[in-house]
């Protein structure tokens, strides 16, 4: 994350640590699209994953195909009239099957992916990821997929060995990786059930995202590879720039107080962080929900940010997200689309008639979800849904 990188620079400089912090412009989209053609099954899983208000239009945007190719795909599959209609979670598997059976779409996705690979490889090499210097990735986390994709790209470039990653938290791990290369601070796939339940990665991303838009690719300018970023949101940019100045001032003061970095009360700090996050994320005051819930939010490709972090939900929509109602729909026993909020807890406090009841029922849902994930790791539908939202924007 951008703000964590800026704060880390303060600590490195103030404490004269033998480290160099570099910022890598990337996103799940900018890393995955160039690699689609190397594993089309995984690519289809990615573009047909869940999220907030997933539509056919959104799925085709994830594929990276051109506008004309998108229009032809819609026509071939008879989806022109439903392109912007929100899809129930249980429909995503059917959408994937239809796309897999469309040769035109698969070819278009493969060709566009191959074209993007040289620019990704060029950028990673330019930024020094092939250097022999010991290095590691640091990120907010959630699925650990970007580390795997960066390592795949570096392997194409001839790098031996694997980069390790250090994360705020991980809900799950990619398949085919070495567990010892993934390090978690706050929660991990195996531990931290209560922390996960009272945590909102969507709110975390809203507050700590970068002021620039999402990285969508790379282009060469004046002999250098430069990131191509989406336009972002001006309101969000102003908030993040103000937050950056506050955090940097805080980091400066904290760094001055540290006499011996080896004697920091890490466990005490972790407990205090957990206490504060549980309260703010899991049971916010009205003022907190209003301040952070009204930040623009996007969980997908290209920062349209047409919704708020705490989306406005009716009483009926809040109840539809209660444990039993949500599980029935996710399992396919009940039909219909359920409107979700990136930060449900904020929405419940702002718009619910009985926010205490709403928060309790949503916590039950999250407990059941993460418990089922832990004890049924082979259930793909659960793996795909373990999220408030897994936002598309990420930088390292």
What are these regions (language model features)?
Residues 1-396:
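Long, low-complexity, Lys/Arg-enriched
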């Amino acid at each position: 994350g951008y703000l964590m990188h800026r704060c880390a620079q303060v600590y490195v400089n103030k404490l004269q640590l033998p480290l160099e912090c570099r910022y890598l412009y990337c996103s799940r989209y900018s890393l995955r699209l160039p690699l689609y053609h190397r594993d089309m099954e995984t690519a289809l899983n990615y573009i047909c994953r869940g999220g907030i208000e997933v539509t056919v239009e959104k799925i085709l945007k994830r594929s990276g195909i051109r506008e004309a190719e998108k229009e032809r795909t819609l026509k071939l599959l008879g989806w022109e009239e439903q392109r912007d209609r929100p899809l129930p979670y249980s429909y995503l598997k059917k959408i994937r099957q239809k796309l897999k059976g469309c040769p035109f779409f698969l070819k278009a996705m493969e060709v566009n992916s191959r074209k993007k690979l040289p620019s990704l490889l060029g950028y990673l090499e330019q930024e020094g990821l092939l250097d022999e210097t010991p290095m590691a990735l640091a990120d907010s986390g959630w699925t650990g997929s970007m580390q795997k994709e960066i390592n795949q790209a570096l392997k194409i470039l001839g790098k031996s060995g694997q980069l390790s990653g250090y994360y705020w938290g991980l809900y799950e791990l990619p398949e085919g990786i070495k567990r010892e290369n993934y390090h978690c601070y706050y929660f991990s796939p195996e531990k931290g059930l209560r922390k996960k339940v009272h945590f909102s990665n969507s709110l975390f991303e809203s507050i700590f995202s970068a002021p620039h838009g999402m990285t969508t690719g790379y282009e060469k300018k004046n002999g250098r590879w430069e990131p191509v970023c989406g336009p972002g949101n001006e309101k969000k940019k102003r908030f993040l720039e103000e937050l950056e100045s506050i955090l940097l001032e805080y980091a400066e003061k904290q760094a001055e107080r540290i006499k011996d970095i080896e004697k920091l009360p890490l466990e005490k700090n972790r407990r205090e962080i957990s206490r504060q996050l549980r309260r703010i994320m899991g049971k916010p005051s009205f003022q907190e929900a209003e301040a952070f819930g009204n930040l623009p939010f996007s969980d997908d490709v290209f920062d349209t940010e047409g919704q708020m972090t705490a989306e406005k939900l009716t009483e009926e929509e809040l109840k539809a997200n209660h444990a039993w109602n949500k599980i029935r729909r996710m399992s396919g026993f009940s039909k219909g689309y359920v409107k979700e909020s990136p930060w449900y807890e904020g929405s419940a406090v702002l718009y619910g008639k009985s926010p205490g009841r709403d928060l309790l029922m949503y916590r039950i849902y999250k407990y059941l979800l993460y418990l089922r994930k832990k004890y049924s790791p082979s259930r793909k539908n659960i793996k795909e849904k373990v999220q408030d939202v897994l936002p598309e924007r990420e930088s390292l």
